């Protein structure tokens, strides 16, 4: 096989080396206690023995960013989509009570463009910094024929640790009378984008809407909020009984994941500010108001269940909204009261 045969097939090995060189400085920023070795090994290593955890339980999560990625590609804006990828993973594991330890990413692309991929990984590193996780490894696969040259996909994998006695088990601990606090989202986050793209398919994404204070594309690409640093201290103080990350499926699919079958979450509409982008989606997409709660976070990215006696103090600490309470099971697991 000739020297340039691989390049002729569409795989640029030298560009791959350049990507690794470019991303090292971003990865280095995320280093934390426990990381062993440097980027470039066959596997990332982490020393659990340095952690002050008596009965460690490892909790892992993996996710991508869905078709929000298509908007980033369309806008040629790649510096924040990595934050979304980290957020989707670490917000899931913090819901189980885990402190994120490390993260790995996977990028598949049709053509290895070092400048673009550096932006993507810089976003991943920023997400890791926000979560307190180390970026200890990853994979960039150049796959001509599988993807168009400008296209790429992004996924990630997070591992966290929890003290066994501090695991969040809402099915066991959440009870009727508990107060539900909602933590504000930064926007749509990373779910429902196939519908979002359809609703706004005929709009100029560089323009704004009467409902928005910035361009539509900037609104749609606002990175997912990471809730780790807000929630972790309270988890360690045993102040939280249940956590629901409001992702795909909105309130109706995600709230029931944090309590048992004998309970319902009673949500009071109007107890928080629904973000303008959701009002725009409902209006321009002709989506039934009730269905919005089955798809989107509606301005609440995370819901926690707390004991009534702790609710007021935690509401202030978290700058949260009191959005409802737990009640004995009614007709459905989630009831939206107007």
UniProtKB/Swiss-Prot annotation:
This is Phosphoribosylformylglycinamidine cyclo-ligase. It comes from Lactococcus lactis subsp. lactis (strain IL1403) (Streptococcus lactis). Pathway: Purine metabolism; IMP biosynthesis via de novo pathway; 5-amino-1-(5-phospho-D-ribosyl)imidazole from N(2)-formyl-N(1)-(5-phospho-D-ribosyl)glycinamide: step 2/2. Its main location: cytoplasm. It catalyses: 2-formamido-N(1)-(5-O-phospho-beta-D-ribosyl)acetamidine + ATP = 5-amino-1-(5-phospho-beta-D-ribosyl)imidazole + ADP + phosphate + H(+). It is an enzyme of class 6 (ligase). GO terms for molecular function: ATP binding; phosphoribosylamine-glycine ligase activity; phosphoribosylformylglycinamidine cyclo-ligase activity. Its EC number is 6.3.3.1. The keyword Isomerase does not apply. One of its GO terms (cellular component) is cytosol. It comes from the Bacteria. The gene is purM. Disulfide bonds: none annotated.
